Amino acid sequence: MSLLSQFYSNKELHVTQAIRSKEDFGDMDVIVKGSSKRVEVENFLTSSNYPFVKNGDVTSFLYKSFQIDLIFTNEDHYEYSCNYFDWNDLGNLVGRISKQLGFKHGHDGLHYVLRNDDRIIKEFLLTTSYLDVIHLLGLDKLKFKKGFDSYEDLFEFVLSSPYFNPEIFKLENLNNINRVRDRKRKTYNLFLKYIEDKTYNKLDGFQRKLTYKEKEEFVFSKFPKIRQEVETLKFKVELDNQIKERINGR
């Protein structure tokens, strides 16, 4: 973007890609590498009479009838973020499949979150290679790199995962936060409509909700190096709980 060229090189800005048949380009998402210049950019927008709104890591403003959303990302996660936000809501759809397998998939990488009830014990960063995640889910890396011409292309790509389970996408099966958010998303709702009458031939066992243990074993099967640390942390948590129970029982 020429407007930001005084602050960033082309390698530090990425205009997210949308399906090529998309007709409505009323907005533009731009991934920004690093946030060290954010205040400087916002001061420039103010002095140039471009009012902006801040929401977390996003700064939004109007430019030549476009809404521009600047998404400021950690430099270490820049490449992953570019892929995550490309192709409409694909990152969110991929995240649904990842979650049912025991992973946490976001714009900053693929993680495994060890919990004790609702308390997070540790979050393990597994990979910051988006193509590795695509491969892990049984999706075609070359197809992803080529991109998508239509919603149908995009949706069929998601359906091609052997781990695809339509139940995990239904709004009634989401928690309240995700349900409220995804109900507003055009691509997500089009996807729900698209899969209504589809039939599937997928891996046995992945057409149901996996248990915590099954998810854990799946994660370990793909990332065996974290198993020992996870087991050690679980043992320490259990030991702490036993000690607390004895103290409270006195």
PLM region spans:
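Metal-dependent nucleotidyltransferase catalytic core
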Residues: M1, V32-L70
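Compact mixed alphabeta submodule
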Residues: M1-L3, G95-R96
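Active-site nucleotide-donor binding segment shared across nucleotidyl transfer reactions
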Residues: S2-E40
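Intrinsically disordered, low-complexity eukaryotic regions enriched in glycine, serine
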Residues: L3-L4, Y8, G34, V53-V58, ...
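Short secondary-structure junctions
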Residues: F7-T16, E42-T59, F103-L110
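Catalytic cores of NTP-dependent nucleotidyl/adenyl transfer enzymes across multiple folds
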Residues: L62-K64, I71-S221
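Short amphipathic beta-strand/extended segments with alternating polar/hydrophobic composition
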Residues: D69-F72, V230
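Terminal (often C-terminal) interaction modules
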Residues: F218-R250
